[in-house]
Curated annotation (Swiss-Prot):
Organism of provenance: Paraburkholderia phymatum (strain DSM 17167 / CIP 108236 / LMG 21445 / STM815) (Burkholderia phymatum)
Family from the record: Belongs to the 4-hydroxy-2-oxovalerate aldolase family.
Principal EC category: lyase
Pyruvate carboxyltransferase domain sequence ranges: 5-257
CDD domains linked to this entry: DRE_TIM_HOA (cd07943)
EC id: 4.1.3.39
Active site: H17 (proton acceptor)
Pfam families cross-referenced by the UniProt entry: DmpG_comm, HMGL-like
Protein name as annotated: 4-hydroxy-2-oxovalerate aldolase 1
Keywords on record: Aromatic hydrocarbons catabolism, Lyase, Manganese, Metal-binding
Catalytic activities: (S)-4-hydroxy-2-oxopentanoate = acetaldehyde + pyruvate
UniProt record, GO biological process: catabolic process; L-leucine biosynthetic process
Length: 349
């Protein structure tokens, strides 16, 4: 492959979920320096849930988005700084503040059926000189053709790149292949495509490779897979695989390997890996950032995290419905108490 892959690191945004949004500015700077030295193309910086994500619903960050962005902007020399915005959480004013702090790429994220709510934010990003990227979360919940039509809307608003986003880590290689082909068939030739994979079924690397085979231009990944659920496609692993395939990625593999093991992995207060709980996310098709919230609810109410996650999947809950996790836990408690009571009555008969 002759074309240069665009390597988009998400350690300082999606990776924030893995440590409950507690990066210090010093840690953000150190990670950014390592990534910049390794020559990634962009570094995404924000609360895990995007600009203004710090809240009771999603969890408060150790710093504000602007503090993190300024910290990274003060040290990077090569990579562009990206940030993420979810309409309804962040506003155009937040985009302006991020731009003033040093961000130059606005990744506007919506649920995969709601691209129409991105119009104001994509148009504003272009107006102030930012690159605008459309980010269709939970892409497994739409058919390939319907998803491509949502991407077409984002393109019409001014997005120059549109992403297939496997937020639940629920897709396999055929799912990715079908969606990338639909994008290529529907979008203009000059509109780039991207893949954002999660590793809940251990397919983050495989899915990213398949996406590139189908013409994908940009690949999201993170050091040590740092991200929600079982994490994102591990950046250093993807680069090693890409190198073995002879692809032009333009990064320094060994610097990335060192950064993953020496800087990022020691920050994890819960291992970012495929285990019982994160596997349940992928199997049930649940938004990966629900993991820590579900674990907290399970501990509080004496439930199994897997039971909560599977029920969330059955109800088709999506990003932004974190407040419903407690409701699901209470419903499961009620069902447990009813079953216990019914069993007790049966014993008396």
């Amino acid at each position: 492959m002759d074309k240069k892959l665009y390597i988009s690191d998400v350690t300082l945004r999606d990776g924030s979920h893995a440590i409950r949004h507690q990066y210090s500015v010093a840690q953000a700077r150190r990670i950014a320096i390592a990534l910049d030295d390794a020559r990634v193309d962009s570094i995404e910086v924000a609360h895990g849930d995007g600009l203004q994500g710090g809240s009771f619903n999603y969890g408060f960050g150790a710093h504000t988005d602007i503090e993190w962005i300024k910290a990274v902007a003060s040290v990077v020399k090569h990579a562009k700084i990206a940030t993420l915005l979810l309409p309804g959480i962040g506003t155009v004013r937040d985009l302006r503040a991020a731009y003033d702090a040093g961000a130059r790429i606005a990744r506007v994220a919506t649920h995969c059926t709601e691209a129409d709510i991105s119009r104001q934010h994509i148009e504003y990003a272009r107006e102030i000189g930012m690159e605008a990227v459309g980010f269709l979360m939970m892409s497994h919940m739409q058919t390939p053709r319907a998803l491509a039509e949502q991407a077409k809307l984002m393109e019409s608003y001014g997005a120059t790149c549109c992403y297939v986003v496997d937020s639940g880590g629920a897709m396999n290689m055929n799912d990715i292949r079908d969606r990338m082909r639909a994008f290529k068939d529907t979008l203009r030739p000059e509109t780039q495509t991207g893949i954002h994979a999660h590793h809940n079924l251990s397919l983050g690397i495989a899915n990213s490779i398949v996406a590139v085979e189908e013409g994908c231009d940009r690949v999201d990944a993170s050091l040590a897979g740092m991200g929600a659920g079982a994490g994102n496609a591990p950046l250093e692993v993807f680069i090693a695989a890409a190198a073995r395939l002879g692809w032009n990625h333009g990064t320094d593999l060994y610097r990335l390997m060192d950064a993953a093991d020496d800087i990022v992995r020691p920050l994890q207060d819960r291992p970012v890996r495929v285990d019982r709980e994160t596997l349940a996310l992928g199997y049930a098709g649940v938004y990966s950032s629900f993991l820590r919230h579900a674990e907290r609810a399970a501990s509080k109410y004496g439930l199994k995290t897997v039971d909560i996650l599977v029920e969330l999947g059955r109800r088709r809950m999506v990003g932004g419905q974190e407040d419903m996790i407690v409701d699901v836990a209470l419903d499961l408690c009620g069902a447990r108490e009813f079953a216990s009571s019914a069993s007790g009555r049966a014993d008396l008969i």
